[in-house]
Amino acid sequence: MALDRSTDSPGGFQVRHRSLGIFQGSSIGLAFWHPSSHMPEYGLCRFATRAKAQDYVDFLSSPACSEPLSRADLVIEDFDHAEHERLTTEYPQASAWETPL
């Protein structure tokens, strides 16, 4: 997962799961959700359009997804810029240079 600089753009949408939280992104084929991921430093995933968010909801609830979710548990919302900013400010990502061996 990497921070998406497009989160600075106005507008946008996010996907929320009823019990897992707000979609943060995916890595190695796994979806990450705040707060259940326990990785607030990644902030929230911003979809530029409602259609792109809907495409991802469709994928997450399809047989093509390795662990499909119930479509009833997923909702598309306006992107919460304030919450994204709070998470990435209060929980900055550690630099690889700062990671002890």
What do these predicted regions represent?
Residues 1-3, 54:
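Charged, amphipathic alpha-helical segments
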Residues 44-45, 50-101:
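Short, mixed-charge low-complexity intrinsically disordered segments
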Residues 6-43, 69-71, 76:
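Short aromatic-glycine-(Arg/Gly/Cys) micro-motifs in beta-strand/loop hairpins
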Residues 2, 13-15, 83:
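Intrinsically disordered, low-complexity regions enriched in serine, threonine, proline
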